[in-house]
Amino acid sequence: MRAGRCASRSVIRACAAACLALALCACTSLTPREPANVADAAAAGAPFDIAGRLSARRGTDGGSASFVWRHEGGADEVDLATPLGQTLARLTGDAAGVRAQWPDGRTVEARTWDELTERTLGVAIPVQGLSAWLRGRARAGTPGTVERDAQGRPAVLRQDGWEIVYAYPDDATPKASRLTLRYEQGQPAEVRLIIDRWQ
């Protein structure tokens, strides 16, 4: 029974780690460089509300979850649930700091996402980037490359040791419905995102 509980905790921890690594990227401890132009700045900060599913693998741990991510005006809120709908955590962040809250009422607060993941998971996970990567853009502050498909849409983005591969449901759809993120440095990780709703 104890081994089963440990395995279950391991899966939830791996899934939460992946979600934390991928979520809430607007609040960072880095000072970003200025965007190339006003249009890029607007796109980088544009609000969105997405819902979908993810699966994550890091080392021998893996897990899956559903998520709803709301991003607006430098504030983010991510609700994580098991595939059967059981709440895993709510993650929130803004300029004042970041928080993780579990269903049993436990709350952990930190100044940055790196600090929060270090305290809750035992390892600092870089969380800058995903809000830009979702839109097929390299995040400001570090070099990145974007390869485009025949329709001019992002096909592969590489930045910060991550490779993000975009898949589209058809040739006419401008936004990717599936993203595969691979990290090959240090502890390799792979995260697959399926976006069911994007507003």
Regions found by a protein language model. Name each.
Residues 139-199:
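Gly/Pro-enriched, hydrophobic low-complexity segments
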Residues 75-124:
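An acidic-aromatic
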Residues 44-83, 88:
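Post-signal-peptide N-terminal segment of Sec-exported extracytoplasmic proteins
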Residues 1-29:
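Sec-dependent bacterial lipoprotein signal peptides
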Residues 21-44:
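Bacterial Sec signal peptide processing site at the extreme N-terminus
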Residues 104-157:
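Flexible, processing/modification-adjacent segments and terminal tails
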Residues 67-70, 91-93, 166-170, 197:
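Extended lipid/amphipathic-ligand handling interfaces
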